[in-house]
Amino acid sequence: MATPANQTGRITQVIGAVVDVQFEGHLPAILNAIETKNGDNRLVLEVAQHLGESTVRTIAMDTTEGLVRGQEVTDTGSPIMVPVGIGTLGRIMNVIGEPVDEQGPVANEGLRPIHAEAPLYTDQSTEAEILVTGIKVVDLLAPYAKGGKIGLFGGAGVGKTVLIQELINNVAKAHGGYSVFAGVGERTREGNDLYHEFIESGVNKKGGGEGSKCALVYGQMNEPPGARARVALSGLTVAEHFRDQGQDVLFFVDNIFRFTQAGSEVSALLGRIPSAVGYQPTLATDMGALQERITTTHKGSITSVQAIYVPADDLTDPAPATSFAHLDATTVLNRAISEKGIYPAVDPLDSTSRMLSPLIVGEEHYQTARMVQQVLQKYKSLQDIIAILGMDELSEEDKLAVARARKIERFLSQPFFVAEIFTGSPGKFVDLADTIKGFRAICEGKYDHLPEAAFYMVGAIEEAVEKGKKLAAEAA
């Protein structure tokens, strides 16, 4: 709600990231941005509570060192506003929409408030539709819903970032869509690396503008909790603008746990009584307010991929448990698979999707996915026997299942466009129909005669056949 702008108040108390401000006249509304100067910097405070006696309690979006009591503060009359539009692509902004990449001001198509209502149910599209990513393992076994939310689980160094880059690249190519990356409370070094990797891999152009596909909004680990608790909303606001223009947008959040963690810090500073495991009492409300805005409308869609850190690997911890309630699919990256050199290292048995139903994806896709999982599961259950007794002790039927499973494992790998500079092999975008056809044929034994090496790092099944012929010719 807008209130009269330019009302001035004075700081009465500063405790860490929490600043109390007293206003003589009209009090600024809850969630309004109020501004002051801290040295040469513009400091934005967001109103969180009305305390009485004309005083509001605010959360600072930057460090509060240097603020003094009695300092003048001005009400902007609206929530935090961030630039939106094509000009944000290829740029890095902070939580309040200021550029932090030293490439000049952000060209924008206007400003939007970071706090907004979720779209009305009547505006939402209720059709279940798949977002084809061109990545075989994802499209076949854990397909993404257009306008859905996907949890990305994985430890350090198993390929989360490369998978994210490939998704951004493929969505831009296949759907002409843009992406927004919100870096929430992660390492500054990783944020810097990602920015440069995006430029190197062709996802973005230096300085942004034409040819860039992804906007970056960062609030990293060293920022105060106010910035980390709001930066996901700033990124989402940029994505919502693209959606309202009729785009299919990909919205990445790395890491959704840090959003909850920052909310917990802010909550404690505001003096709220903590709830389970010390989290904020408003945990489900905060998460819902963010997640419900990520949806498909009749204009366009926002599909969200959220990296989820699981504290102490405890899936019952309130933070990840609250995230799970909103997810449509999970993509689990497994170190054991990456150690075999199979990339993307997506676990085909652990990754799940609500979309994998015959009513949504069709009977053929569903049956093929289940056949693939059955073969892989059988191989997994035989691995102990193979390790102790060797392959020779297996029955003929089991030997065949193992051979097919090893081919499937290798066929689940594929060369990425964004990794061409490392691998030297050109990236492949595989259509869904080709993916289904290829895996079905392997399960039915049509390619039992080909060596398993033929299936490694190829796109469609035809390439595996060609590679098989080449390998045979070289061996002859």
Curated annotation (Swiss-Prot):
Any matching Pfam family: ATP-synt_VA_C
Entry EC no(s): 7.1.2.2
InterPro entries xrefs: AAA+_ATPase (IPR003593), ATP-synt_VA_C (IPR055190), ATP_synth_F1_bsu (IPR005722), ATPase_a/bsu_AS (IPR020003), ATPase_alpha/beta_chains (IPR050053), ATPase_F1/V1/A1_a/bsu_N (IPR004100), ATPase_F1/V1/A1_a/bsu_N_sf (IPR036121), ATPase_F1/V1/A1_a/bsu_nucl-bd (IPR000194)
Sites where the protein binds ATP: 154-161
GO molecular function: ATP binding; ATP hydrolysis activity; proton-transporting ATP synthase activity, rotational mechanism
Membrane topology: Peripheral membrane protein
Gene3D superfamilies tied to this protein: 2.40.10.170, Bovine Mitochondrial F1-atpase, Atp Synthase Beta Chain, Chain D, domain 3 (1.10.1140.10), P-loop containing nucleotide triphosphate hydrolases (3.40.50.300)
Keyword Nucleotide-binding: yes
Principal cellular location given in the protein's record: membrane
Keyword flag DNA-binding: no
Listed GO CC annotations: plasma membrane; proton-transporting ATP synthase complex
Annotated compartments: Cell inner membrane
Reaction catalysed by this enzyme: ATP + H2O + 4 H(+)(in) = ADP + phosphate + 5 H(+)(out)
Assigned keywords, A-Z: ATP synthesis, ATP-binding, Cell inner membrane, Cell membrane, CF(1), Hydrogen ion transport, Ion transport, Membrane, Nucleotide-binding, Translocase, Transport
EC top class, as a word: translocase
Annotated PANTHER family: ATP SYNTHASE, ATP SYNTHASE SUBUNIT BETA, MITOCHONDRIAL
Biological role stated in the UniProt entry: Produces ATP from ADP in the presence of a proton gradient across the membrane. The catalytic sites are hosted primarily by the beta subunits.
Complexes and interactors: F-type ATPases have 2 components, CF(1) - the catalytic core - and CF(0) - the membrane proton channel. CF(1) has five subunits: alpha(3), beta(3), gamma(1), delta(1), epsilon(1). CF(0) has four main subunits: a(1), b(1), b'(1) and c(9-12).
The protein's name: ATP synthase subunit beta
Organism encoding this protein: Rhodopseudomonas palustris (strain BisB5)
